[in-house]
């Protein structure tokens, strides 16, 4: 950080050794000139004067800019006018061999050494010809037009070194306030910029003067340096190389940002929580967490976001754009993260591993969601009833119970559902598809949960245990039904006779007594049944299926009750007295 004292121009200038300057191509020299021009513009309005025009004539002969230096002097007149004096050609030509380069200290306490390679451009802008002494009025009534044009540039210099100027005894208090509060502002629409060069580029947009045009795509730019950077997109040129890892970049600013990965430097600190960041843009995004600001609004639906990237991602929902395509199967995605996660399907790679149980996942979000099983964390709470959930989508689906919202509608029959999974499961009824197949017995199922429950018949797994009596169950729903035996709860009531039941299936079975309905028909013999369970048991007569096997002797049975009766032969149990 530069503090009060002398600031040499070399501290802000771009320096090239003699041999490197000769290696620069015309485009690179043009870029160098434009950067130096911007710096000179900033210095002029801090009180730095211009040299004699005879020195400029030397530049017209394309002399090496590295060998041209000049000393400029400033003098204040009592009448409130500032006289700018140049030096003659003879003294200027001798400066290249002088060892002592004198510097100028202006009223802000800064000293600068001028490089003259770009001063010809300044003279053209000021329309000065044939004079060695130019007077510039500094009183309010006689402000020069050039000073008006570049007032924003002066603000940039003051803003850039605000820490040096804030405590400077030479700077008026009102000017300090301007430094702190008013960055460069556009006179057309009032938009503010932190950097004067961006303001200048913005003003070129208003004048429709974009003189630099790309021959590849016809895009126009306000200055040649932007055009040079843009053309690297077409050429693929990446001239800036990281010496640590060899990675290449097309902009030096990107290289500087990348190098912080190796150095670990995080110069941007949040004053609210102390968190540090490698990029200023990351700090700005983070700061909105504290302020709650969401400046990016979707024009389609009005939804607001705290990051422009989030808005861009959201807008693809409306446009249907899916620019990220898998080269393996052709599937397209709206976001790069979606494609990255999808590619794992082809590679089989699972990068994220749970330290508790060793289970691996192909997405970090899935691992985070899984780890809540071990921690028991349920961070999402319903404001209506206080119920908590492990996942946000579960809370969203639950909340629709209170609102009655059913946004997912079947196009075949018009039935609506609270969540997408309910609609997806329902659609299989119309298609007849049963995509989930048991590897043990080849039985197929419409839902993955049904397959998981079925597979426990083969494994014997009963993960759900009753805390009251210790009985185990293969399904959580069976445990919930069983638990009502202990509580005596019977939440299902018949509207005809007001009889109550502990199970919804028992109520459905009971209702058929009133309706006389037998809606389940055997396709083999035409026999009808009032319950689906009865039909399934009956169908085993035709298929010969015996899914219940005794582990003691290997005998098979068509019904679970028959297996239970048989098992008593081995145990010797005689429950009926």
UniProtKB/Swiss-Prot annotation:
All copies of domain KRAB, residue ranges: 7-78
SMART domains, per database record: KRAB, ZnF_C2H2
Keyword flag Repeat: yes
GO molecular function, one term: DNA-binding transcription factor activity, RNA polymerase II-specific
Zn finger (C2H2-type) start-end: 184-206, 212-234, 240-262, 268-290, 296-318, 324-346, 352-374, 380-402, 408-430, 436-458, 464-486, 492-514, 520-542, 548-570
Keyword list, A-Z: Metal-binding, Repeat, Zinc, Zinc-finger
Gene Ontology process terms (BP): regulation of transcription by RNA polymerase II
Entry GO terms, CC: nucleus
Name by which UniProt lists this protein: Zinc finger protein 880
